[in-house]
Amino acid sequence: MDVDRDEVARRLGEDGFVVLDVRSDGEYRGETTAPCDPRPGRIAGAQHFDLQMLLALTPDEIRTRLGPPEDVELVAYCHSGSRSELATQILASLGYRAANYRGSWHEWSRDDSLPAETG
């Protein structure tokens, strides 16, 4: 399942709605960014869960980190929607309600009215 920018923006901060940034540490902190992105950083309030970590953890370790599947709705994003698609498939296989924000940071970073943070 995919969600769009407007839904992510509207639901930011909503209880049980968790935005997961599955990019690298440097991308998440805003220390590295693709040349095509006008600003570095992440969606404000996003939790970091690097795809490489997700691939390395056991299902129980993932559940410990994210909480019980019935308690959260997850939206994953990356730079362009590819890594987050894989993350979404993994999370859905574990019973999570997981959606992919396909526009990801490539889209979000272009709209200065959308909240972003670095560090």
Residue positions per predicted region:
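Rhodanese-like catalytic fold shared by cysteine-dependent sulfurtransferases
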Residues: 1-18, 22-75, 79-119
